[in-house]
Each structure stands twice: as C-alpha cells, then as structure tokens.
Amino acid sequence: MVTLNNIREAQARLNGIAVRTKLLEPHIHENGEADKRKLFLKPENQQPIGAFKLRGAYNKVASLPPQERQHGVITYSSGNHAQGVAYAARAMGLKCVVVMPDNAPATKREATKALGAEIVVVGPGSKERQLKAEELAAQHGYAIIPPYNDEKIIAGQGTI
C-alpha cells in the first residue's frame, strides 16, 4: 500500500527532475454567470517529456538498487511511460529497452528513440508486450519497469 511517506520520498527523488507545475483555477462562466463549481488544472505537459508519467517512471528507476539496474532497464508501453523510462535511464546513464506495439504512434516511437531507448516492436496486445519484456529481462538481466500497478510508480505519480 502506498503511503504519504512513500509519496514524500518520491518527491525528494524527483526534486530537480520533475517540473513543479502550478495548480491553475480557471474562472468558468456559463450564460454570463460565474459557475459555483470548482475546476483545477495541473499543466503536466510542462514536464520534460510532456506528460506526468515522468514522475512514476523516474521514481521507480531511481529506487532500484545499483545491482538491479546495472544491466539496464526495460519497460512495455505505447507512449508516455516509455518516454518517462527512457528519460530516467538516460539521466542515470543506463541502457533502456522499450517494448512497443506495432500500432504505437510513430511520434511516440521516435520521441522514445530520441531519448536513447532501443525499441522492440511486437503485436498490439498489452500481454504480448509484457511477455516480451519479461523474456528480454530474463535473457539480459534488465530490470523491469512496469507501466502501472507498482508502488514506486504509483508513489511517483502521486507527487503530482
């Protein structure tokens, strides 16, 4: 279970990495009258990769003990998480492999490659991506950085 302390630890790891985005409260008017509801926006597109996924990915990679990440990291994602892991790996001087579906947008593949990741393309199924990442991790000793359902990923995202 992720605790507030886990999120604070993640925040410390992300200090100087993730942009501290402002909380915006736009004034909404409907039919000329101020709306009583509150709406808040957090412009996470200001992060270095253009998405909040940097937070969880970086926290997870930075949390790995040196012996677990010595051969590099691998993830399976079709976009923003892939870029977050690639960004974190580059910042830490690690090899990064990303398993992406063949239907991932070319812009996502190119952005991930531009961050230094090696791209492995598989079919469109999410289970197929995960299995390929697990296979490559076992063969090469890569640390798996899952795109979700991981306490370090969740704690990092919680710093938003």
Describe the role of every protein-language-model region:
Residues 1-160:
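PLP-dependent amino-acid enzyme catalytic core
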